[in-house]
């Protein structure tokens, strides 16, 4: 079909693909896989050969499932590639072996596109608000966006579920790091000249959607984003997911959250909880929509 676009978001842990009808602003199909792009990055400063091969395998699976040519896809990549010393060689390797040409986008563009996706998601879910806070917990960075009427304010924090997990396993300073980051979040919030007290707190990315999925009783294999979208989580839901991580066997956890997410869910939950505390919020609305949807909507708007 002439009115289709494929968008790919290669994150620090996840690889997400969307087939999108850009004339009617509708999702046709999608694919998601954990590729662990940032594995080992904090120690070596490099994207590993093993990670690159996982990305190429994921592209090949996705192109067969969604029937597309990788060279025609709109492909973006984020924090892991921004940080890696060998990012250009890594991107050249991916293009040479798959045809997919990735663009490294900066944190502000990543936040703008994710915000675009959430604005459309709010309309779709009939949630009428111009003022909200958006949290995007990534693998290598975490973005906080405050949307106030026609303006938005972005702060990108240099930590994510993968990098903080790797760092804490190396130095054991997780809670110290979280406290330091809380100070940084508060500093950013103090620059705003309006109150966010009544702003809904919206969260996207794998950690919030996984906790929502656990709350709703889904397994990894019957996850339904249409039901997850709009789910409201509170601090007790976060605490329940942390308890489950300690109580369940590895086999049970793989069925619940998927193989590539188990090792990061604990730290991801602590990061999520950090923002509840720093923002002084009691609950959070979860959306599955994120960067890949934002890239697709941005493309659709450019074709209008």
Which residues does each predicted region cover?
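Short glycine-aspartate micro-motif
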Residues: 5-9, 132-136, 201
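Post-signal peptide N-terminal segment of secreted/secretory-pathway proteins
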Residues: 72-73
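Helical "lid/coupling" subdomains associated with nucleotide-phosphate turnover
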Residues: 19-22, 36, 40-65, 80-91, ...
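N-terminal basic/disordered segments at the start of proteins
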Residues: 1-27
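Ser/Thr-glycine-rich phosphate-binding loops at phosphate-binding pockets of nucleotides
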Residues: 12-14, 118, 138-144, 206
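A structural signal for short, well-ordered beta-strand segments
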Residues: 31-35
